[in-house]
Amino acid sequence: MTLDPTKHPDWKIALDAESRMKTVETLAAELGLEKAELLPYGHYMGKVEQQAVMQRLKDRPNGKYIDVTAITPTPLGEGKSTTTIGLVQGLARRGRRSSAAIRQPSGGPTMGMKGSAAGGGLSQCIPLTPYSLNFTGDLHAVGAAHNLGMTALTSRMQHERNYDDATLEKLSGMARLNIDPTRINTGWVMDFCVQALRNIIIGIEGDGRRNDGFMMRSHFDITVASEVMCILSIARDLRDLRERMGRMVLAHDRNGKPVTTSDLGVAGAMTAWLVEAAKPNLIQTIEGQPVFVHTGPFANIALGQSSVIADRVALKLSDYHVTESGFAAEMGYEKFWNLKCHYSGLVPDAAVVVATVRALKNHGGAPQPKPGQALPEPYTREDVGLVEAGCANLLHHLGIVRRSGVPAVVCINKFHTDTKAEVDAIRRICEQAGARVALSEHWEKGGEGALELADAVTDACNEKNEFRPLYNWNSPLTERITTIAQEVYGADGVEFEPLAAQRLKDLQERPDADELGVCMVKTQYSLSDKPALKGVPKGWRLHVRDVLFFGGAGLVAPVSGDISLMPGTGSKPAFRNIDVDVETGKVTGLF
């Protein structure tokens, strides 16, 4: 008997569903994989040999490609993963061969503010605990590859300090790279949110010995912000992955020349850590539909997409494939539209914009809800006025999708506490704007509650598609950044601080400047670069304070506002609720 999500936490619902789930071999056979194309990880998870699948099905047409995005979220999240899974379950109930692609959750948010990213209620993916903790080891492999690169860099700096040119050549055949310790492009990574590691000193020599490393300032980023994760997300195949790994710029020499992983002789070994991680993972929804889980970059500080490889494989195996972009349309969908689709060559058939009464109330003027705390009073009573005022944010995000030329569906992700009047107000405003809108109760009712959404998406996929990029990649980097700020965020313009302006000037002078993508780094809690500005801010300019460069990924990342690549852990973290039943070995408290 299915548990009631209004009475039971997600982890209990998942445990109940896991007692009836298919083996991964059964799941793969239903998906159309041959036996040799599946690498089982236990009974219920597996990896897919993507190169074998793509070769076998190279002449098969792709299925319909749908992206799920959202309005500007609250810190509680508005249910994009839940909607992605619910939509796939709804499509399956309509007899359509469907699959989902979601990102692998990071340990930091899982143990911090968010808990698992497996969906929720009756629209989850399972098995929940392995998916949320460790999974098939991909995040560990990404971290190991990244930190191996840093090991090669810092050890090389130590040896060049300790030995003259002749000795370096004699000992290892190394030529001096003359690395500038003040121009190290990256730090180390780990998969937790540790604010204490944002700024550190490494290589402290203690008693003066010269074998304890090169003393310098350094830092840790969260693993999902690593360039290695981004490369894994956009690589089309293993060859593309290897080539990109060799172009990563870890530092500069004293003459300003980039020092790459190839210069350090470590690119091949870094790629070796990723051979298995490059294969998409396969699990299932609680109703038995296939879910591809592959890569996990955040959308505010990185690409925010599951992998190109997973989507390409799934589109050969499914009639409808639903992928998810991180955070809201101005962040995740913009990067899906102008970066992921550029790298993959794929064209979406439809996009879903998820909206909740809760987030609309926030944009209408209600105070920001906080994880782990009771909802403020405006969220616990009916307030149609707040919902109507907040719909300006929804219409802005709908406009972003329309600008891409892709047919859009607004999904009202209904919570069981929402009132009919509040839901009717959203529907009325969307319909007045000419939008296709669907109410979905997938959290509470699973696929049965997503039938209206499934039908709306099916209809949208049959509409005329005029997909087009936002900008020309041949245009200058500053022009592309300004286009994103004005056309997507709604800014009046862009202010480049001197450091950012100089770095953009240097990057624009590269011969491959028109091959570099623009991957914005900005808060996810506002259309602007100030998280407190809700709704649709007016009369503001985007301030770009720095520009990061990722040579392997081929991305330029303008940084706006006060945002860190290493998030912090708050005062009421999720890990306090997580434990293990020592009699059964089952993990409890994941949500």
Swiss-Prot record:
Pfam families: FTHFS
SUPFAM superfamilies: P-loop containing nucleoside triphosphate hydrolases
GO biological process, one term: tetrahydrofolate interconversion
Keyword Membrane found: no
Binding sites annotated in the UniProt record for ATP: T74, P75, L76, G77, E78, G79, K80, S81
Keywords, in A-Z order: ATP-binding, Ligase, Nucleotide-binding, One-carbon metabolism
Record field: catalytic activity: (6S)-5,6,7,8-tetrahydrofolate + formate + ATP = (6R)-10-formyltetrahydrofolate + ADP + phosphate
Domain of life the protein comes from: Bacteria
Gene Ontology terms for molecular function: ATP binding; formate-tetrahydrofolate ligase activity
Assigned EC number: 6.3.4.3
Associated pathway: One-carbon metabolism; tetrahydrofolate interconversion
Family in the record: Belongs to the formate--tetrahydrofolate ligase family.
Protein name (record): Formate--tetrahydrofolate ligase
